């Protein structure tokens, strides 16, 4: 099984670049699962419904986030409605969304866990 992890996709320029390159990369390397960090995919930072949809449409199977996950109030409901959009699992259980997503690949199941490090950052409910 081949996994592709794409780091911070930043703004519409990052989404556009990924849209241009991802299909070819997935095809050339026979990628089975693509995980994309989308927490800065909106203009400025955060994630919006538009940038989440764009990342999904260009081939992200799972979208992870971090400390900018909830920067956009208008997008908060996505964390409870978009199954493959993750917030850090080490946030408090009372925080909206989930931090684990399981993909059924037919021959096996793959769980993607979104953990956030906290070096030089505010502590979390670990």
Each language-model region and where it sits:
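Acidic, metal/ion-coordinating pockets
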Residues: 1-126
């Amino acid at each position: 099984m081949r996994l592709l992890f794409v780091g911070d996709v930043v703004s519409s320029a990052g989404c556009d670049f990924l849209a241009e390159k991802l299909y070819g990369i997935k095809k050339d390397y026979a990628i089975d699962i693509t995980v994309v960090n989308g927490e800065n995919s909106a203009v400025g930072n955060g994630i919006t419904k538009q940038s989440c949809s764009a990342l999904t449409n260009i081939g992200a199977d799972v979208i992870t986030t971090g400390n900018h996950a909830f920067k956009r109030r208008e997008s908060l409901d996505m964390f409870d409605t978009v199954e493959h959009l993750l917030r850090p699992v080490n946030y408090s259980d009372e925080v909206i969304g989930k931090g684990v997503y399981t993909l059924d690949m037919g021959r096996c199941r793959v769980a993607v866990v979104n953990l956030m490090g906290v070096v030089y950052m505010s502590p979390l409910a670990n």
